[in-house]
């Protein structure tokens, strides 16, 4: 299968640690899980967020910074995370390439869909950075867009601190119940916080299945007993 995995930036740091942006034990666990999926014969691409480094809305709230500028700064944070993952993966023997929607030829490739597909066919992990290269789009939307462009069979959204989709935030609402399977239409109707709503709508429109799992269960994401499934219809 061809899989695209969406990782949040926060998943790269360790909760309760020293407050650093990256934690090697976490990076090692992610690398091991990616390797496990790859060893099963799957082609894998990643989209990484930048929330561990920067969130644009926080800057616009504190300073007179326009939203597009803040969004571009957030895109740069995703590039930094992508480079960290690339180099770390390669120290573990996992061939990896970074493709950026904003041209940065000194440090990574520019996003060219056919080239990215070729890397995946050769067994390399592909990391897509800098979002879609335009403001007002989240990395959730980027993940759906790249999954569709790459012809992915499934988008795996790896969540930090939860094991799937719930009717509410299980950390704040003890009555929140786990959802094993649901359609994209129901997610939108019930305003469930699975992902950005525009991302869910895009996946629904184009028939893309989304699997939501905990970040520590990436290697088992294809097992039916793991996580939650958002079906197009």
Predicted regions and their residues:
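C-terminal catalytic "cap/lid" subdomain
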Residues: 1-233
